[in-house]
């Protein structure tokens, strides 16, 4: 029994692997780097048709995302093409609108409610301190004060400021009359 020699048979079975040259390695590295840089969608991907949908559906449909409405648009204006809108026909019976009616208050109650309004008091305090209000708040204050004036006129209530001014004028006249410089 002869034994085969290990070294001779192994060399015959194995073929020598060719090593890549430096130039080939550099070229492959450049290609890998270029492929790595270019990621994302390819140029013009919107205009390319999707082949998978065409094959499955059996119908020829263009799935272009740029295409919008399929409605034809008339480019020229013709007299016959102008369509006048028809007025809506009114129902024979008037339809009653269901509106949640606010409970009506007497002018006295409404005036008392407006005078005791905390928001109005706070905004008036801010105005007195010299702050400027936003346009929305200012318009609300103006409307509320106008409503208070209207209610006071309806109820016949006058502001007490006029009486105080008249009393001050009377005091000034009395002081002027008693002034000794005027007597000369």
Swiss-Prot record:
Residues 159-169 have a biased composition (Acidic residues). Residues 1-106, 159-184 are annotated as: Disordered. One of its GO terms (biological process) is ribosome biogenesis. Residues 8-32 have a biased composition (Basic and acidic residues). One of its GO terms (molecular function) is GTPase activator activity. The keyword Phosphoprotein does not apply. Pfam families: YihI. NCBIfam families: PRK05244.1-1 (NF003560). HAMAP family: GAP_YihI (MF_01058). This is Der GTPase-activating protein YihI. It comes from Pectobacterium atrosepticum (strain SCRI 1043 / ATCC BAA-672).
